[in-house]
Amino acid sequence: HPVNSIDVNSELKELLLSRGKWPLFTHQAEAINKLRDGNNVIVATPAASGKSLCYHVPTIDLLTEKRTNRALYLFPTKALAQDQLETFDDMADGLNIRSAIFDGDTLPEDRAQIRRYAQLIITNPDMLHLGILLNHRSWSRFFRELKLIVIDEAHVYRGVFGSHVANVIRRLRRLCRIYGSKPQFVMCSATIANPEDLSRELIGLPFEVVNQNGA
């Protein structure tokens, strides 16, 4: 069911309207409102239910509200990262948000610029570990201003790979504490039986669950 009971800035609303994405579905509005109330949120709804809007909308809000704010998106594959960068840039068209992918394909000469200027960094768990956390001193400004961390396709982080990613996230949270930030988390997953367990295993924080598909 579409729902209008949510405030987003007028420019963003116009953009969403022009792309046929407004009004939002109930599960999108629920996730965004829970996030605004200060919660960490896991959205576990079927494919093609518009989960990515649950994090693109708050990210755009956050990054237009204060230009120094930073956000981090984690995807398991480069193809997904590329898809969502294009979706984000299309949704944020004309809002002057600096977004960039930072992965193994990022040219060395671009890396310092991205580190310094990108408000939204899109990466994968391995690059987060090897390229960002291990060089955390040169990312200190990013960590200080980091407000939101998005983990999409979270259901793939199971078993050995899941344990590895959970360790990377723990390290990320520790560095955020050291640099004085306390980012919120949004996780998105396919429909799974126990989203609370997944979020606890992976992040180690309490999460609000959104799993009623309102599309």
Q: Would you name each region that the model predicts?
A:
Residues 193-195:
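Canonical AAA+ ATPase core
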Residues 13-179, 183-188, 197-203, 207-215:
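Conserved P-loop/Walker A NTP-binding site and adjacent catalytic elements of P-loop NTPases
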Residues 1-7:
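Interdomain "pre-motor" coupling segment immediately N-terminal to P-loop NTPase/helicase cores
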